[in-house]
UniProtKB/Swiss-Prot annotation:
Signal peptide: 1-18
PANTHER family to which the protein is assigned, alphabetical: IONOTROPIC GLUTAMATE RECEPTOR
Tissue: Expressed in the outer plexiform layer of the retina of the eye (at protein level). Expressed in the forebrain and hippocampus (at protein level).
Record remark: domains: The M4 transmembrane segment mediates tetramerization and is required for cell surface expression.
Originating species: Mus musculus
Assembly information from the UniProt record: Homotetramer or heterotetramer of pore-forming glutamate receptor subunits. Heteromeric assembly can be the result of both receptor subtype and flip or flop form and according the composition, one partner can be dominant with respect to the fast desensitizing current component, whereas the other can determine the steady-state component. Tetramers may be formed by the dimerization of dimers. Found in a complex with GRIA2, GRIA3, GRIA4, CNIH2, CNIH3, CACNG2, CACNG3, CACNG4, CACNG5, CACNG7 and CACNG8. Interacts with HIP1 and RASGRF2. Interacts with SYNDIG1 and GRIA2.
Disulfide pattern: 75-323, 732-787
Biased composition annotated in UniProt, kind: Gly residues: 866-875
UniProt modified residues of type Phosphoserine: 645, 710, 849, 863
Residue ranges annotated as Cytoplasmic topological domain: 558-584, 604-609, 827-907
Protein name in UniProt: Glutamate receptor 1
InterPro entries xrefs: ANF_lig-bd_rcpt, Glu/Gly-bd, Iono_Glu_rcpt_met, Ionotropic_Glu_rcpt, Iontro_rcpt_C, Peripla_BP_I
Originating gene: Gria1
Main location: membrane
Length: 907
């Protein structure tokens, strides 16, 4: 029962909602002219609708450039309860319309020029033209051209073209002709003629475009050599007969393809319709704006039909509202209509009609039309995915190799080590046999795989290929291909965008990048105290402080702990009732114990108390880890001679000024830094272009010589392959540091559309997969190198230590021995002076006593004495005699009073 009840409730609510959906939908219309073709197309489209709901128009004729009148008409229609408004705008009124639509949630469907807005309630029927226009300019390889535009339709297309021009280094002259008079047109084209500007883009609406083209014909700027690109979607709407007769080249875009099935059917219905409000209009070929108007009506019809099927209530019961209210009250159902409009998709007069989340056309196709002296033809199409796709030609490159084998091809190249070099005895050979090198063998391998005969020819000007900025002519090997003087270029020719526009490249046969060449630094010899290098100086300082700290703590612990004190054994004759306590860990013994433990040699005394043993244990653990770590690193530091390079990367170069750096004066490396937007490379370019003296060199050889003679004060930036090759050439004093700054490749070039492109490309891929390319590079870079392998000889140098590696240890040994002898002398002198002062009289010390003093300080005790007896205890715990030396106890002395010799008891 609950399910049945819910089912009936749902059905009842759906019926109520469906009943509330209006059968008649009021829609607004704002048109600039009642007799316009767009107005008639609007009426015709409404007459073709058969499914409910019925769309009832509220049409106003308005001056679309007058903001006040547009505001009044817009608010008037909104107050009448329209659900959506169809209309046109201009630059002066577009901001007002988008503002009202966003505030009131009223949808505005327009075929006017697209605007860059985030307002989702403005549905733009006209596709955007920016990307398609840029693709066509790229297709024709324009570098310098004039851009004529009408500011009334906005500046979005111009802004996109200027941004691209900055990226691709185009030279664009923008001219606004909004207020240009007939005299102004004459002066404009005279000025362009003086500057030899014959490539022109015209960005205007159809009415103004026809006027401009009329002026061009009147001024006779439509002859052979002129090329105009019309940034307009109605190429077939424009009268170009005068251009066809005079020989100018005109290219444009066509949105409506009248030969397609749907446009042809609709056009037939349009012509045969007997609707009274559009019989006075010529329907032979409607303008593209009229086609957009027709599709706009269908968009609204599809959206409201979808809302009706979904039973969404959009009725405006008492919700007409006031668009001038402050604050503005948005229409609650406006968002539902906006979503329904954006979800519409169908095939219309203008092709696929579909919108993105911003209300702009997407997934559309533009037909590219070209008119020459021989007539009008479609040269391709443009869409968002494929960009510009040229029309198919009869000849397909690479389809048949039979013609390739019937002639001898010219292979242009350049003398550059190790790619192409003259043999030492070249005069004894003829033809291709005079040359050797990487590219010579590569050309032979490719010819073998493709199956053609060839002849190597060195390019006459010795250049790779660049376009002259004044004459626009190509030089070098690229020029040889462009102007048909060569068929293939096999050389270290970098694949770049500007070259790819005029010639075809194969897949890269070698990858490379910009690298840094410096003079190879001398290997750093180990210092006298290199044995200290395994640990940082901070660690050594911490070890010293730890040693002192442990010794002091051990001394204090031994003094405080009662278990560290012990009684001395008594000598004969002493009072045994007196207890004499001793402690072996004085401050000097504590230092000695810590030093012995650190040196892992041990000591003849050890702590007796638990606290003292804890101190000793943690110190032993500490020294175990430190000594083990030191030993592990010692071998590497003593046996390896390092080359300390002052530069390791481009960042190191950029942040210093002591070492100069530069590139080839004219080449792709210099262009890379000039065009780079990366902060580090921009900083490097700023330095290079302002450095005095100049850091640029004319040839790679000059850069190499400058590096070798600069004593490490100059770094040369060049392609990594050449850097690696020079590193293997005598005198072996240069080296490559750091990684590559960019990534590019060398390719084999052929003229545009050459039948060799496909076979050559396949040959390069096959050689790469077979490892032939790697073998060739290894042969000409390393096998024929003059400096040996990078790691050769390193094992012999690291197997034995030289005296310089351990000289510091010997210095410390000698210094320690000398210090010990000096301290012994000081001890002897100090003790002798102390003993002599203690005597109360003038004593004559015989030579025998001196000898005994030098011999030892520990003398045999009396037989009655204990093992450790005596009246005093030394620092190390041994018992010593109070009198030094002991033989002095029997030294005869002269009394001051009697002058008689006295015994020891007389002292």
């Amino acid at each position: 029962m609950p399910y049945i009840f819910a089912f009936f409730c749902t059905g009842f609510l759906g019926a109520v909602v469906g009943a509330n959906f209006p059968n008649n939908i009021q829609i607004g219309g704002l048109f600039p002219n009642q007799q316009s073709q767009e107005h008639a197309a609007f009426r015709f489209a409404l007459s073709q609708l058969t499914e409910p709901p019925k769309l009832l128009p509220q049409i106003d004729i308005v001056n679309i450039s007058d903001s006040f009148e547009m505001t009044y008409r817009f608010c008037s229609q909104f107050s009448k309860g329209v659900y959506a408004i169809f209309g046109f705008y201009e630059r002066r009124t577009v901001n007002m319309l988008t503002s009202f639509c966003g505030a009131l949630h009223v949808c505005f469907i327009t075929p006017s020029f697209p605007v860059d807005t985030s307002n989702q309630f403005v549905l733009q029927l006209r596709p955007e033209l920016q990307e398609a226009l840029i693709s066509i300019i790229d297709h024709y390889k324009w570098q310098t051209f004039v851009y004529i535009y009408d500011a009334d339709r906005g500046l979005s297309v111009l802004q996109r073209v200027l941004d691209t021009a900055a990226e691709k280094n185009w030279q664009v002259t923008a001219v606004n002709i909004l207020t240009t008079t007939e005299e102004g047109y004459r002066m404009l084209f005279q000025d362009l003629e003086k500057k030899k500007e014959r490539l022109v883009v015209v960005d205007c609406e159809s009415e103004r475009l026809n006027a401009i083209l009329g002026q061009i014909v009147k001024l006779e700027k439509n002859g052979i050599g002129y090329h105009y690109i019309l940034a307009n979607l109605g190429f077939m709407d424009i009268d170009l007969n005068k251009f066809k007769e005079s020989g100018a080249n005109v290219t444009g875009f066509q949105l409506v393809n009248y030969t397609d099935t749907i446009p042809a059917r609709i056009m037939q219905q349009w012509r045969t319709s007997d609707a009274r409000d559009h019989t006075r209009v010529d329907w032979k070929r409607p303008k593209y704006t009229s086609a957009l108007t027709y599709d706009g009506v269908k968009v609204m019809a599809e959206a409201f039909q979808s809302l009706r099927r979904q039973r969404i209530d959009i009725s405006r019961r008492g919700n007409a509202g006031d668009c001038l209210a402050n604050p503005a009250v948005p229409w609650g159902q406006g968002i539902d209509i906006q979503r329904a409009l954006q979800q519409v998709r169908f095939e219309g007069l203008t092709g696929n009609v579909q919108f993105n989340e911003k209300g702009r056309r997407t997934n559309y196709t533009l037909h590219v039309i070209e008119m020459k002296h021989d007539g009008i033809r479609k040269i391709g199409y443009w869409n968002e995915d494929d960009k510009f796709v040229p029309a198919a030609t009869d000849a397909q490159a690479g389809g048949d190799n039979s013609s390739v084998q019937n002639r001898t091809y010219i292979v242009t190249t350049i003398l550059e080590d190790p790619y192409v070099m003259l043999k030492k005895n070249a005069n004894q050979f003829e033809g291709n046999d005079r040359y050797e090198g990487y590219c010579v063998e590569l050309a032979a391998e490719i010819a073998k795989h493709v199956g053609y005969s060839y002849r190597l020819e060195i390019v006459s000007d010795g250049k790779y290929g660049a376009r002259d900025p004044d004459t626009k002519a190509w030089n070098g090997m690229v020029g040889e291909l462009v102007y048909g003087r060569a068929d293939v270029a096999v050389a270290p020719l970098t694949i770049t965008l500007v070259r790819e526009e005029v010639i075809d490249f194969s897949k890269p046969f070698m990858s490379l990048g910009i690298s840094i060449m410096i003079k190879k630094p001398q290997k750093s010899k180990p210092g006298v105290f290199s044995f200290l290098d395994p640990l940082a100086y901070e660690i050594w300082m911490c070890i010293v402080f730890a040693y002192i700290g442990v010794s002091v703590v051990l001394f204090l612990v031994s003094r405080f702990s009662p278990y560290e004190w012990h009684s001395e054994e008594f000598e004969e004759g002493r009072d045994q009732t007196t207890s004499d306590q001793s402690n072996e860990f004085g401050i000097f013994n504590s230092l000695w114990f810590s030093l012995g433990a650190f040196m892992q040699q041990g000591c003849d005394i050890s702590p007796r108390s638990l606290s003292g043993r804890i101190v000793g244990g943690v110190w032993w653990f500490f020294t175990l880890i430190i000594i083990s770590s030191y030993t592990a690193n010692l071998a590497a530091f003593l046996t390896v001679e390092r080359m300390v390079s002052p530069i390791e990367s481009a960042e190191d170069l950029a942040k210093q000024t002591e070492i100069a750096y530069g590139t080839l004066e004219a080449g792709s490396t210099k262009e890379f830094f000039r065009r780079s937007k990366i902060a580090v490379f921009e900083k490097m370019w700023t330095y290079m272009k302002s450095a005095e003296p100049s850091v640029f060199v004319r040839t790679t050889e000059e850069g190499m010589i400058r590096v070798r003679k600069s004593k490490g004060k100059y770094a040369y930036l060049l392609e990594s392959t050449m850097n690696e090759y020079i590193e293997q050439r005598k005198p072996c004093d240069t080296m490559k540091v750091g990684g590559n700054l960019d990534s590019k490749g060398y390719g084999i070039a052929t003229p545009k559309g050459s039948a060799l492109r496909g076979p050559v490309n396949l040959a390069v891929l096959k050689l790469s997969e077979q490892g032939v390319l790697d073998k060739l590079k290894s042969k000409w870079w390393y096998d024929k190198g003059e400096c040996g392998s990078k790691d050769s000889g390193s094992k012999d140098k690291t197997s034995a230590l030289s005296l310089s590696n351990v000289a510091g240890v010997f210095y410390i040994l000698i210094g320690g021995l000398g210090l010990a002898m000096l301290v012994a002398l000081i001890e002897f002198c100090y003790k002798s002076r102390s003993e002599s002062k203690r005597m109360k009289g003038f004593c004559l010390i015989p030579q025998q006593s001196i000898n005994e003093a030098i011999r030892t300080s520990t003398l045999p005790r009396n037989s009655g004495a204990g093992a450790s007896g005596g009246s005093g205890s030394g620092e190390n715990g041994r018992v010593v005699s109070q009198d030094f030396p002991k033989s002095m106890q029997s030294i005869p002395c002269m009394s001051h009073s009697s002058g008689m010799p006295l015994g020891a008891t007389g002292l």
